[in-house]
Swiss-Prot record:
This is Tyrosine--tRNA ligase. It comes from Pseudomonas fluorescens (strain Pf0-1). Residues 336-396 form the S4 RNA-binding domain. SUPFAM superfamilies: Alpha-L RNA-binding motif, Nucleotidylyl transferase. It catalyses: tRNA(Tyr) + L-tyrosine + ATP = L-tyrosyl-tRNA(Tyr) + AMP + diphosphate + H(+). Pfam families: S4, tRNA-synt_1b. InterPro entries: aa-tRNA-synth_I_CS, aa-tRNA-synth_Ic, Rossmann-like_a/b/a_fold, S4_RNA-bd, S4_RNA-bd_sf, Tyr-tRNA-ligase, Tyr-tRNA-ligase_bac-type, Tyr-tRNA-ligase_bac_2. GO terms for biological process: tyrosyl-tRNA aminoacylation. Keywords: Aminoacyl-tRNA synthetase, ATP-binding, Cytoplasm, Ligase, Nucleotide-binding, Protein biosynthesis, RNA-binding.
Length: 399
């Protein structure tokens, strides 16, 4: 096991806040594997790179020799996390939650080592909790303290409804730490209230309080708003290799350092060397290619990453392409949005038609439906389909 100083440096990499650092140092000094918990409510079936920030940190804890607990909130998922919400979230059914949970496990084990991961479901203890124990849990906190939470306070002061079951969410999440006897809990910055609840409840149940590590919310491809499927600025971890690669290579130059720190498993020394190269005149795109290849390889394998780099990622299956597939070469000074490529290649009548097709899911690149966020990278070759009958293999070359 690495020294306490080395462990602390890796643990704090990219983190927003560590509470309480002195307590964590004391835990690490004992030289015993710590129980590291992170909870995920399976409210949607697909994960994007923003979700993997926490999972990557769990992987780092595994590499340090600690015991990682991947907690699936099948019970809390039916409540709905109110964090940051201005209205009550509709609860999911048990069937929806369990179906999504199975998909989660398949995806996260592309990052975590299954042999070193304990998968837990919080329904295991919550379903067995009787009325007396539940009343004891709710007695650990007051309504006044609950209303100190920013989102609840805003809704209360603006006369927006707060359902009683929403007060239960942070209590149940906090009790998860009691049930698992967690030493450290990870969460996004928007989860700080819930994480602190875990510390408080552990003390109330006679346990040593966990330390909490908050991780930032990853910015999306625009570099401004947090990554979100609804905003279209996301990279799904199940997206086709070519699509994933193209999106990552097209991120703003300034954003790539944030992505390297939070998404890459390269050392900070290596990342700082890349930064020095760029400051010395290296092309930022060459560095983004390294990032894109690493991430594509993580989810699809080395061969898929190499193919994506060559513009050959995820070709359409034989028989789906016309025999006389047109070959089109375009030139440009920089990467181009897919709408402009389709228009310039003659697959659509005009840019407006391209935008309409993209909005309706009528555009495929290498067999995968893409939206307007897809960027055609200089040097790439893709098979493009606009509508049902317009096909072309398009290469975008540098002017």
């Amino acid at each position: 096991m690495k020294s306490v100083e080395e462990q602390l440096a890796l643990i704090k990499r990219g983190a927003e806040e560590l509470l309480v650092e002195s307590e964590l140092i004391e835990k690490l000094k004992r030289g015993q594997p710590l129980r590291i918990k992170a909870g995920f409510d399976p409210t949607a079936p697909d994960l994007h790179l923003g979700h993997t920030v926490l999972i990557n940190k769990l992987r780092q804890f595994q590499e340090l020799g600690h015991q990682v607990i991947f907690l699936i909130g099948d019970f809390t998922g039916m409540i709905g996390d109110p964090s940051g919400k201005s209205a009550t979230r509709p609860p999911l059914t048990r069937e929806q939650v369990l179906e999504n949970a199975e998909t989660y496990k398949t995806q996260v084990f592309k990052i975590l080592d299954p042999a070193k991961t304990e998968v837990a479901f919080n329904s295991t203890w919550m379903d067995q909790m009787g009325p007396a124990d539940f009343i004891r849990l709710t007695s650990q906190y007051t309504v006044a303290r609950m209303l100190e939470r920013d989102d609840f306070d805003k809704r209360y002061t603006t006369n927006q409804p707060i359902a009683i079951h929403e007060f239960l969410y942070p209590l149940v999440q906090g009790y998860d730490s009691v049930a698992l006897r967690a030493d450290v809990e990870l969460g996004g910055t928007d989860q700080k209230f819930n994480l602190l609840m875990g510390r408080e409840l552990q003390r109330g149940y006679g346990q040593e309080a966990q330390c909490i590590l908050t991780m930032p919310l990853l910015e999306g491809l625009d570099g401004v708003k947090k990554m979100s499927k609804s905003l279209g600025n996301y990279v799904g971890i199940q997206e086709a290799p070519g699509v994933m690669y193209s999106k990552l290579v097209s991120i703003p130059d300034a954003l790539m350092w944030r992505y390297f720190e939070l998404l890459s498993f390269r050392s900070m020394d290596e990342i700082n060397a890349f930064r020095a190269d760029v400051e010395a005149g290296a092309n930022p795109r060459d560095i983004k290619i390294k990032l894109a290849e690493e991430i594509v390889a993580r989810f699809h394998g080395e061969e898929a990453a190499a193919n994506a780099h060559r513009g050959a990622g995820n070709r359409m299956k034989d028989g789906e392409l016309p025999d006389d597939l047109p070959e089109v070469e375009l030139t440009a000074a920089e990467d181009m949005p897919i709408a402009a490529v389709l228009n310039k290649a003659g697959l659509v009548k005009n840019s407006a038609a391209a935008r309409d097709l993209l909005a309706s899911g009528g555009v495929r690149v290498d067999g995968e439906v893409v939206d307007r966020s897809f960027i055609y990278v200089l040097g790439a070759t893709h098979v493009c389909q606009a509508g049902k009958k317009a096909f072309a293999r398009i290469t975008l070359k540098s002017e």
